[in-house]
Amino acid sequence: MSYRTNSQTYNTLSIRGITPPAAGGSSTVGFYMDNMPITDSANGGIRQSMGTIFDIERIEVLKGPQGTLYGEGAMGGNIRYITNKPDPSGLDYSVRVNGESISESDGISTVTNGMINIPIADRLAARIVGYRRDRNGVIDQVAPRSEEDVDTVDETGVRAMVSFYPTDEAEISLLYNRVKAEYGGPGLGYHCFNVGTPSDPNGQVPIYDLPGTTCAGEYDVYNSGDPYVTHLGHPTFTSGGDDEQEMLNLSISWDLPFGATLTSSTTQFDRKSQYSEETSPRFAAGVQGIVDASCFGLNPACVPGTLWSMGGDGLFANQTDRFAQELRLVSNTNSDWQWTLGAYYKDEDNTQNDLDACTVGGSPVYDTFEENCYLQYGFDPAVSIDDQRSVIQTLTAFIPGNRIYKNLTEESVYGELSYTFNEQWEALVGLRYARVGYGLENGSAGSNVRSEVDLSLQNDTTSTSPKFTLTWRPQADLMLYATWSNGFRPGIINPGVVARLAELAPLTAEDPIAKGHYDFLESKKLVDGDEANNIEIGIKATVADGKVSFTGSLYNIDWKDMIIAYDYSTNDVFGLTPFTVDLIENAGGAESQGLEFEIRAELADNWNLNVGGDFNWTAEITDATALSGAAASGRYGGVGISEGNRLANAPKNSFYASLTYDFSARSFDAQARLDGYHVAESWNTANNERPAPSYQTIDGRVTFYKENWKIGAYIRNIADEIIVYEFNQVGFRYGRPRTVGFEVS
């Protein structure tokens, strides 16, 4: 499993190399908290919130296509947090405080977690968990504005559960979870220099003349220097944003008298996030070109240099409202027959404002700008407020912006049936049938009013996903299995195509070029779903009198009709928005093959070793004929997507090892631990334009225990390795530098 942060609010989560190459569809990885689905399904999983790992009983990671155990099916796998439940037997509480100093950052970052378990009656209890994370940044902005540690994170959250146990066979739990985060920025290090692309020397980041900047401290993956700086800095622009999530779940579990457990899970999920981040000067140059083309000569306020040339505004605003209901019936007897039956319903509304209208309906007026207006902070400070108002009034008449409204509904049934033939052999079959509806409404240009829509589309798909597993246990401490499973993502609608079709429609009668674009994009409005077929052979064994355990699996995933995004240009038609269209299409196919393993060994008294890793030797596009060498969406340079390209965020290998030693120190029990990690080079996009280099880190920790107290000290990234998660024309996204911390609980 791979998890990395690509900006302050964008995260990438993948299992076995199955990473969504395009936003907008369902995530390839499902996410649960207990029985509550919290998957980022509207954005392809790129904004998945992970929450805090405190007062958690365990974390389950189910790899490969999942769809026959839980309602929220996924093509790559499922992750599930199992929380500790309220306990009526007695009062309990815990507190954990972390303080840490991050290299390249001033001050102390802190994380505070707390839990209290309150018995209310003999069979009724409440458990409340709260936390606050205050993390200092490491990125420094340089001239023309000097500001240090700008990529801050301030996050608070609460998880409260009330559980009632009316009988020994029944449980009713109400779970409320709320997270609120505020982010500083930018979270990217943009460096004003020219860096050639290793795979294509012609695909380069342009050199920009940045006034007031000497470009001291350049850094790239091949040269040394200070990486944690950004050569951006509008004199008045402030990057940052916020993310607020609220989740409410009612879960009822009942052990029925005929040998089965019935579970009902009802979930309401609401999320609102908005973020504005300075990005590369390329975006500012593009917007300045719009100013020049659309109103220069017609409006005297529109002159070259109106906008600040050192950075553009990367903006999004997103709102999600989801209701989900799941019923699951699972056998709980010792019979040779075991089974699971389930039904799932989901209704999700999503509003996106990647290019928000600058007014709340009506004529553009500066005083009524929405806070997400994409031009609001882009002007050179020397331009007067009156001229800014005049320019935006002209531009919003030409490019008014709009909102996109999405609706995702799913009705599915699923189940598994297994039979144990004898002590050695067991067979399992599973099936999932899903009916998914994906609707999209394109808001009228210049309007933020929900009822004003100029185009509505609907894409309905059905899928059947089977699963087969054969298990052999030749002896009590050895198990081998073989699995074939299928995962499916539903079809979606091209949001960028919808808006461009509305612009092209009035021009098709007289302009044959516009007609050609219109016909092509009309055929691309609806995108079929993609699917993955997984073959897996695995082993689980225990040897040396239980002192060594081993798990391993070989997997082969055939990804068909893969959904991918690329840029499509209509710049040869006069009068259209001069932006390319982010076109989503079923590009062809991909394949992922590899070996996963984990070894746990007791080396000697008090010494334990854990080693694990993944060899993902094949993770490549096998069919790209539908793309014809197109450039991946949102990236600079014409490096095409081709057969043989490696899938995004899929390193060829990754390993970890941890060594622990338990000892006594005066009146304390203690443990010393050393962890090492290696992640090979990977690509951030399917066109393999620029790689994120490999990295290795070593962490160390010493912890002392006494009664209910635990005191520890740790160092993460001991060697202060420069970790580059992403490298493209927007900048560098880094992992944490050396961090020295303490923990008391």
Regions found by a protein language model. Give the residues of each.
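Transmembrane beta-barrel wall of Gram-negative outer-membrane proteins
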Residues: 104-186, 192-194, 199-208, 246-248, ...
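Short acidic/polar hinge/loop motifs at secondary-structure boundaries
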Residues: 36-63
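N-terminal periplasmic accessory domains that precede
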Residues: 12-16, 29-34, 47-49, 74-97, ...
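Gram-negative outer-membrane beta-barrel transporters
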Residues: 423-427, 549-558, 579-685
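C-terminal beta-signal and adjacent terminal beta-strands/loops
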Residues: 363, 558, 676-685, 703-745
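Extracytoplasmic beta-strand/coil segments of soluble accessory domains associated
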Residues: 1-36, 57
